[in-house]
A protein has these predicted regions:
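Short beta-strand/loop motif that positions the catalytic acidic residue
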Residues: 212, 218-220, 224
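Conserved alpha/beta-hydrolase catalytic His-Asp/Glu region
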Residues: 127-136, 147-210
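Conserved alpha/beta-hydrolase "acid-adjacent" motif
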Residues: 225-231
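Flexible "cap/lid" loop of the alpha/beta hydrolase fold
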Residues: 102-107, 111-150
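Conserved alpha/beta-hydrolase "nucleophile elbow" surrounding the catalytic nucleophile
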Residues: 27-29, 89, 93-98
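Conserved acidic catalytic loop of the alpha/beta-hydrolase fold
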Residues: 71-89
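Catalytic active-site module of serine/aspartate enzymes centered on a nucleophile-bearing elbow/loop
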Residues: 242-290
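Conserved HGGG/HGGXW glycine-rich cap/lid loop of the alpha/beta-hydrolase fold
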Residues: 6-66, 80
């Protein structure tokens, strides 16, 4: 299996499929690169090179005790980009992976980046505070960590239902998918799982958003109960000049599965022609409800 080594020696597993302009897929918490199995085949078939890696501590990557802050995670992404010598790449970040996109570009620049996509992303910040009064209270994340400490399998099983809107949004999500999600999540180290809750909940990305100088697509579920849209995508879209903002009005957080019939075509349109080619779908303020 292919691996790259990061600055501190942590080995990251990655998948590398196809040829053409690179698309780097950055998974969300608490999953790994396999979450992209419903997007990767369509991207490869359309002529793109798809690289999907496991974040440190997750999936098949090494599980160190430290390094789960966003500076280190962004440096890990840089190690991958440099080792594979990727240029004109599109960075696609889902959920906490959107934070890596933002921090990578603000920390390392956009010389290797042609465009960016934020899907259900935590940017520009989730935690409630003076600069984010409508954010998520710290107690919510404290309860998540306590649940992980107390009974991680049970917590992850319950979390998976909210993740896909099962039983809440009338989505038909199979028991097999929920079991797969929990199994993938359990591959991660408990240290990484809890440390990343702290990272994605407490990190303020407002200062990173100015780095989005490349064409950017923002996609979010209007019914996302995991990463509420009003404290994330609605704010991010106002901070990224000329971003194309797509809201899947009734979609949950796990829209890479529930709404793949909308997500995949939107990705391909954006990749194929950039933000200009897709701009006819904008409404006032750049926001489109679909």
């Amino acid at each position: 299996m292919p691996y790259i080594a990061t600055a501190d020696g942590t080995r990251l597993f990655y998948n590398d499929w196809g040829t053409g302009r690179p698309v780097v897929l950055i998974h969300g918490w608490p999953l790994d690169a396999d979450m992209w199995e419903y997007q990767a085949p369509d991207l490869v078939a359309a002529g793109y090179r798809v690289i999907a890696y496991d974040r440190r501590g997750f999936g098949r990557s090494d599980q160190p005790a430290t390094g789960y802050d966003y500076d280190t995670l962004a440096d890990d992404l840089k190690a991958l980009m440099d080792e594979l010598d990727l240029t004109q790449a599109t960075l696609v970040g889902f959920s906490m992976g959107g934070g890596e996109v933002a921090r990578y570009m603000s920390r390392h620049g956009t010389q290797r980046v042609a465009s960016a996509v934020l899907i259900g992303s935590v940017t520009p910040g989730l935690l409630q505070g003076p600069n984010n009064p409508d954010g998520v209270p710290a107690s919510v994340f404290a309860e998540m960590i306590e649940g992980l400490k107390t009974d991680r399998p049970a917590f992850l099983a319950t979390f998976g239902k909210q993740f896909y809107g099962a039983g809440m949004l009338n989505f038909q999500v199979s028991n097999e998918l929920l079991a797969w999600t929990a199994n993938v999540a359990m591959l991660a180290s408990p240290i990484a799982t809890m440390a990343c809750v702290k990272a994605f909940s407490e990190t303020d990305f407002q200062g990173d958003m100015a780095a989005f100088t490349v064409p950017t697509l923002i996609i979010h579920g209007g019914a996302d109960a995991t990463v509420p849209i009003d404290t994330s995508a609605d704010r991010a879209a106002k901070m990224v000049p000329n971003a194309l903002y797509r809201v899947y009005e009734d979609a949950p957080h796990g829209l890479f599965f529930t709404d793949k019939h909308r997500l995949n075509p939107d990705l391909l349109v954006f990749l194929g022609g950039g933000i200009e080619a897709a701009s006819h779908r904008k409404l006032e303020g750049g926001k489109t409800l679909v």
